[in-house]
């Protein structure tokens, strides 16, 4: 693959990456920070004169990746997890390493890519660890920009680690930044499992290619060989940069919190059963429950002219065998429902479809999945979710605001548990606080230390 081909692949797929990951994060100062750090690292690489493009994506998925042609991406989810400038620099340096070593071009030449549209791969071993930790591989593949995972071989990942550590050291950062961040990701698996609840195994990037302890050990050994005089971590400046950054769902994608989903722009609200865990993505909202039960919310075409009953029969499920097709009304909204059957992840499932006509011509879709032997048990809780769907009042709309990373200085007598009570996210608040700040026990807290919390302010 020529350098012109690499540039073409990057140019063609950059818009697809933006679409898949919520676009650029709307914060010029933070975008500028990521770009300046990236350019500084690129200048220390083997390709300092290449045109590099660094983008902070508006996604809470913890991820970073690169495209051939010098395109490098990090998500705000990754920024929220990192603790120091050195850790972020290590991740960006790793991605630059994939580009300078032409790993994407090598994989393409070997025929291991699922088409040019799949030219971007997760750098950290295909990791998904943020609040959206239940999102499926298919959601990214369908966008076309990330049609595969684990595109890089183990040796290529090792080489990118080595190059990233080298670039980090050249500009004076602590070369242990990569090992620190990989270790943090590895220790995060437990929280992912709790968040995901009963989500199917293999549904996340983390399941597919977790960072191994061997890779962490190797990164530590490489860092020990990198001689840096007075290495910088840049913790304080880094935390000051991300203070106020959105954590979790962005306003444009709605908010999945505490068992309910609310979207200000669409003016909709619905809740899911207590035992289900919600995950939000640019394409849909999913909720996983026990025994492979699941709920999916997404949208159909706008300004459909027929009834919702006709919409199910003639458009949404026109190729399915339907039963119990009927019109219903819920909270003043025209709707229809029908039953069908299908296979999901190799399992036979009963499927309930609900189509809803909303304001401004929107068509909303709720899909309920259950194993046949569990359908009767789940029918009532699924019915409650269906009839919880409604538009919101002006007062409710006004109160909808994103969660943000805020800084807090540890005071005398405070503990992990007491500070965690300040968190706006109540579910697994202690676990989240420990993960955000890299602390495991109260003795890790120091009076006067700055820590991250999640706040509504």
Regions found by a protein language model. Name each.
Residues 7-11, 23, 32, 147-148, ...:
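Extracytoplasmic and endomembrane cell-envelope/extracellular-matrix remodeling and assembly machinery
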Residues 73-90, 150-155:
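Short pre-active-site segment immediately N-terminal to the catalytic Zn-binding motif
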Residues 74, 89-98, 102-103, 118, ...:
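Active-site recognition of the HExxH zinc-binding catalytic motif
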Residues 78, 83-87, 96-113, 128-129, ...:
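Catalytic Zn2+-binding segment of zinc metalloproteases
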Residues 416-424, 430-434:
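Short alpha-helical segments in extracytoplasmic peptidoglycan/chitin-binding modules
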Residues 428-457:
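Extracellular LysM carbohydrate-binding repeats and other cell-envelope/extracellular binding modules
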């Amino acid at each position: 693959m020529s350098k012109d081909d690499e540039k073409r692949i990057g140019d063609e797929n950059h818009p697809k990456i933006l679409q898949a990951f919520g676009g650029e994060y709307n914060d010029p100062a933070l975008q500028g920070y990521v770009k300046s750090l990236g350019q500084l690292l690129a200048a220390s690489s083997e390709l300092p004169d290449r045109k590099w493009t660094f983008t902070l994506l508006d996604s809470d998925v913890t991820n970073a990746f690169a495209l051939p042609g010098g395109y490098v991406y990090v998500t705000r989810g990754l920024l929220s997890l990192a603790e120091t400038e050195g850790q972020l620099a290590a991740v960006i340096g790793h991605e630059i390493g994939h580009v300078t070593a032409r790993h994407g071009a090598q994989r393409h030449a070997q025929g291991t890519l699922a088409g040019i549209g799949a030219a971007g791969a997760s750098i950290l071993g295909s990791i998904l660890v943020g609040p959206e930790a239940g999102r499926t591989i298919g959601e990214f593949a369908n966008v076309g920009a990330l049609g595969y995972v684990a595109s890089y071989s183990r040796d290529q990942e090792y080489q990118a680690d080595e190059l990233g550590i080298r670039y980090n050291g050249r500009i004076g950062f602590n070369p242990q930044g990569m090992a620190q961040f990989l270790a943090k990701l590895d220790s995060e698996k437990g929280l992912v499992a709790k968040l995901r609840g009963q989500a199917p195994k293999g549904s996340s990037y983390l399941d597919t290619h977790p960072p191994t302890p061997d890779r962490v050990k190797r990164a530590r050994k490489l860092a020990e060989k990198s001689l840096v005089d007075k290495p910088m971590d840049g913790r304080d400046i880094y935390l000051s940069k991300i203070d106020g950054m959105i954590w979790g769902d962005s306003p444009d994608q709605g908010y999945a919190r505490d068992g309910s989903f609310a979207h200000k722009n669409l003016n909709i609200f619905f809740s899911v059963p207590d035992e289900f865990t919600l995950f939000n993505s640019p394409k849909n909202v999913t909720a996983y429950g026990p025994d492979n039960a699941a709920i999916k919310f997404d949208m159909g075409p706008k300004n459909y002219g027929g009834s919702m009953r006709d919409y199910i029969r003639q458009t949404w499920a026109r190729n399915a065998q339907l039963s119990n097709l009927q019109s219903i009304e819920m909270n003043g909204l025209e709707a229809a429902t029908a039953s069908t059957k299908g296979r999901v992840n190799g399992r036979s499932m009963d499927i309930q479809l609900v189509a809803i006509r909303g304001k401004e011509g929107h068509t909303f879709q709720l899909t309920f999945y259950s194993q046949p032997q569990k359908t009767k048990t789940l029918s009532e809780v699924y019915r409650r979710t269906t009839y919880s769907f409604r538009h919101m009042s002006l007062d409710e709309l006004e109160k909808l605001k994103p969660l943000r990373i805020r800084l807090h200085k540890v005071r005398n007598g405070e503990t992990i548990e007491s500070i965690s009570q300040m968190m706006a996210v109540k579910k697994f608040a202690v676990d989240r606080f420990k993960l955000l700040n890299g602390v495991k026990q109260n003795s890790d807290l120091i009076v006067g230390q700055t820590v991250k919390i999640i706040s509504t302010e």
